[in-house]
Design a protein with these regions (language model features):
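Conserved beta-strand-centric core segments of catalytic alpha/beta enzyme folds
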Residues: 1-36, 40, 93-124
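Metallocofactor- and cofactor-centric catalytic cores in central/energy metabolism, strongly enriched
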Residues: 2, 20-31, 44-52, 58-61, ...
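Short hydrophobic/aromatic-rich motifs at helix boundaries and adjacent loops
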Residues: 5-8, 41-45, 70-74
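General beta-strand structural signal in soluble alpha/beta enzymes
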Residues: 7, 53, 86-87, 115
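Generic detector of short, locally flexible boundary/turn motifs and exposed helical patches
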Residues: 14-18, 49-51, 77-81
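Noncatalytic linker/hinge segments flanking ATPase motor cores
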Residues: 16, 45-54, 89-100
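Signal peptide-proximal N-terminal region
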Residues: 35-47, 78-81
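Conserved catalytic cysteine-centered active-site region
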Residues: 58-112, 120-124
């Protein structure tokens, strides 16, 4: 490991919340998670250099597979473009996304990464 990597903070949505009943979809929760998570650690979207999303079943339950692109839609600051990728590893998707971000930070490619793990499993 060439440099130390730190997790600055985190945010977790309410598991009991019924998204459909509250007229929310995957993107609404994603956007809220980005902004609330950054606020929790006193960062702004402009501080993020790379983004990783862990997700297992968005294609099946939400008809959406390309979740890295959600960053661009979640804040105008991201319109300038940041590298963003989605990682799928069943129940370990969020962990794999974290490991991918960690590897980029260890290499010195980036100084600050955002990692989001998100699921909406409607029929399980």
């Amino acid at each position: 490991m060439s440099s130390k990597v730190y997790i600055l903070g985190g945010y977790q949505t309410d598991f009991a919340q019924n998204w459909a009943r509250n007229e929310l979809d995957l993107f609404d929760v994603f956007k809220d998670t980005v902004h609330t998570g950054l606020n929790e650690v006193n960062l702004e979207p402009k501080d993020i250099e790379v983004a990783h999303v862990g997700n297992f079943t968005a294609e099946l339950f939400c008809n959406q597979g390309h979740l890295g692109g959600f960053f661009v839609s979640s804040d105008p600051v991201f319109y300038s473009g940041i590298p963003a990728s989605r990682h799928e590893a069943a129940c370990a998707s969020g962990s794999i996304a974290t490991l991918a971000a960690s590897a980029e930070l260890e290499l010195g490619r980036y100084n600050l990464a955002a990692v989001i793990g998100i699921e909406q499993m409607k029929n399980v």
